[in-house]
A protein has these predicted regions:
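Helix-rich effector regions associated with P-loop NTPase G domains
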Residues: 2-52, 59-79, 85, 91, ...
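Canonical P-loop GTPase G-domain recognition
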Residues: 77-79, 85-140, 245
């Protein structure tokens, strides 16, 4: 079901939530302790490499990047790869590049590894970066084997700057969903989609209109997908089985559908690009 022009105009003019309740959320619990060990291991490994290739999600180009890379920028050539460009709304790509350049990042590339978009540009860029470094000579770069790749596990920053940044990272699948809460994540996703007028979920799930109430949306999703469950209810005449929507299952589908790009491309850092800091900054 597609939104008619009138319905789309009505949705765009609707008064959506201006903020998302963030108080009382334990962000530290979302990021497992083993990542601290991973950071130490990565830091020791960095001494062995000639160039750092940092891979980050293009939907959050400004949020959640590891400060470890910032500390090593002056010592090692550095390339930032913003992957999953096919899932990101890159309307503001020029502003993203300008923002990153203001942070000292001049070597940035957007990629889509699934369709091999721009991926083949990485090795030539790395070769050029190493060749430009005063520590290396061009002939050393061209010897066989051309280069060795030292892969490291994905490790987040030891401290997340805000609850909202943590939610963005969670939406991109950086942490296990159950640590944050699937229904909480689904609500934040709905809030974000409506706020930025991305109404692809209405069309995908065949809803009558855009909605800002996550319970109503998940109920419609559950009914459409047949995700229901029997629940026993105690009444004056005994136990009665009733059928009710399986909200957790609907929330999981909502999140997975977003991550596959079926709800349309989204830029989760749009507010940051426009100069608005993430909400509920941690002390």
């Amino acid at each position: 079901m597609r939104l008619t022009p009138r319905a789309l105009c009505s949705a765009a003019q609707a008064a959506w939530r201006e903020n998302f309740p963030l108080c009382g959320r334990d962000v530290a619990r979302w990021f497992p302790g083993h990542m601290a060990k991973g950071l130490k291991k990565m830091q020791s490994s960095l001494k062995l490499v000639d160039c750092i290739i940092e891979v980050h999600d293009a939907r959050i180009p400004l949020s959640g990047r590891n400060p470890l890379f910032q500390e090593t920028l002056g010592l090692k050539p550095h390339l930032l790869v913003l992957n999953k460009m096919d899932l990101a709304d890159l309307t503001e790509q020029q502003k993203i590049m300008q923002h990153l350049e203001g942070e000292g990042l001049k070597n940035v590339i957007f990629t889509n590894c699934v369709k091999d978009e721009n991926v083949k540009q990485i090795i030539p860029m790395v070769t050029e970066l190493i060749g430009r470094s005063h520590r290396y000579h061009r002939k050393e770069v061209s010897e066989r084997p051309l280069m060795f790749l030292l892969d490291t596990p994905g490790v987040l920053a030891p401290r997340i700057e805000s609850v909202e940044t943590g939610l963005k990272l969670a939406l991109c699948g950086t942490v296990l969903d159950h640590l944050v809460g699937e229904e909480t994540m689904a609500d934040y996703l709905l809030y974000t989609l409506n706020k930025h007028q991305r109404f692809g979920y209405v069309q995908h799930y065949g809803l009558g209109s855009a909605c800002d109430n996550v319970e109503r949306v998940l109920k419609s999703v559950a009914v459409k997908l047949g995700k229901t469950q029997k629940v026993k209810v105690l009444t004056g005449t005994g136990n009665v089985n009733i059928i009710q929507p399986n909200y957790p299952a609907a929330a999981r589908d909502f999140l997975q559908t977003f991550r596959r790009g079926l709800l349309g491309s989204v830029m989760l850092d749009l507010d940051v690009l426009r100069g608005h800091p993430p909400a509920e900054t941690l002390p």
